[in-house]
């Protein structure tokens, strides 16, 4: 039977669907708002170019997996603030918890006047982390801060300076974590020199033709040429490579890293800042391999959109 529905031109249909049929109250109010173009012009005068933005729109409201800009256009948010919103925008439980806390106090500095929720979260993270050994958790603010503290912990525990990271890895944008990050553009360009005692091994990548055997051989060659294993404090790796191509570490690779670390007294750090908290179907991506790291760094989706990070181990 022929359709009785009149078809719209593709462009017209796309424009119509971009406008929300259920506009949130705050967008439906009869108030004057700036356009995306006006905000872009203001931004160009007030914000450094180094703070890049991908989308030429400005957010006004968000709910679950959807976002509305200041002009009322509705979008599906596939980015989730780069892995920060595994629970979606404005999850009711997250909002309720934040409001309840605001009614009590906002900050006391745990080092000055400690508070119970810090301990509550530490206990939960200790219980969730893989492995049967007792654990403790340090809480900080950002993923880069968590990674830096993991390095400090490894250096203090082993008395060694060296850190081995992998090609394509991303660990943050502070000076130390940039030194560990395995790509130049856009973060490392023209901002060196970087800290010493940071070494890089090849990441096993089918896309780049690098096998697990190649990667392990590269790591062992590094021990022979640049990084004396007795002076290496930690090997850090993302169980799922993030900015380097979203490539999972082969389980065989992870097991061999564990064996190498055990042999040389090196701490294995799993950087779960992007991959953690359910993004791979388990609390932590490294759980799929069955390998237990010495330290786990966490951030992003742990707090459902609020700045919170930690080191578990």
Q: What is the role of each PLM region?
A:
Residues 2, 6, 15-313:
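Conserved N-terminal phosphate-binding loop of PLP-dependent enzymes in the Aspartate aminotransferase
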